[in-house]
Amino acid sequence: MSTVEERVKKIVCEQLGVKESEVQNTSSFVEDLGADSLDTVELVMALEEEFETEIPDEEAEKLGTVQDAIDYIVAHT
């Protein structure tokens, strides 16, 4: 089974249409990976589906980087 980090990065690549080499743990979804507000909503939905969890809107707004998403998933699954 892939690690949480690998799974999150795979989803980021798929949702944002970026290469795996562009996705670092410190990458900002908006500033570094070019996500807009719709992209971030779709990204959160994909993470919720993959990890079978719900990410409340107020928490989703705090997920600014790849590492933020990884940390949230690890803490809540």
From Swiss-Prot:
Organism in which the protein naturally occurs: Marinobacter nauticus (strain ATCC 700491 / DSM 11845 / VT8)
Pathway assigned to this chain's UniProt record: Lipid metabolism; fatty acid biosynthesis
GO cellular component assignments: cytosol; membrane
Modified-residue entries (O-(pantetheine 4'-phosphoryl)serine), positions: S37
Xref: InterPro entries: ACP, ACP-like_sf, PP-bd_ACP, Ppantetheine_attach_site
UniProt-recorded name of the protein: Acyl carrier protein
Protein family per UniProt: Belongs to the acyl carrier protein (ACP) family.
Source taxon at top rank: Bacteria
PTM annotation, UniProt: 4'-phosphopantetheine is transferred from CoA to a specific serine of apo-ACP by AcpS. This modification is essential for activity because fatty acids are bound in thioester linkage to the sulfhydryl of the prosthetic group.
One Pfam short name: PP-binding
Keywords from the UniProt entry: Cytoplasm, Fatty acid biosynthesis, Fatty acid metabolism, Lipid biosynthesis, Lipid metabolism, Phosphopantetheine, Phosphoprotein
Localization (cell): Cytoplasm
General function of this protein: Carrier of the growing fatty acid chain in fatty acid biosynthesis.
A GO MF label: acyl carrier activity
A GO biological process held by the record: lipid A biosynthetic process
TM region(s), chain numbering: none
Principal place of residence: cytoplasm
HAMAP family: Acyl_carrier (MF_01217)
Carrier domain segment(s): 2-77
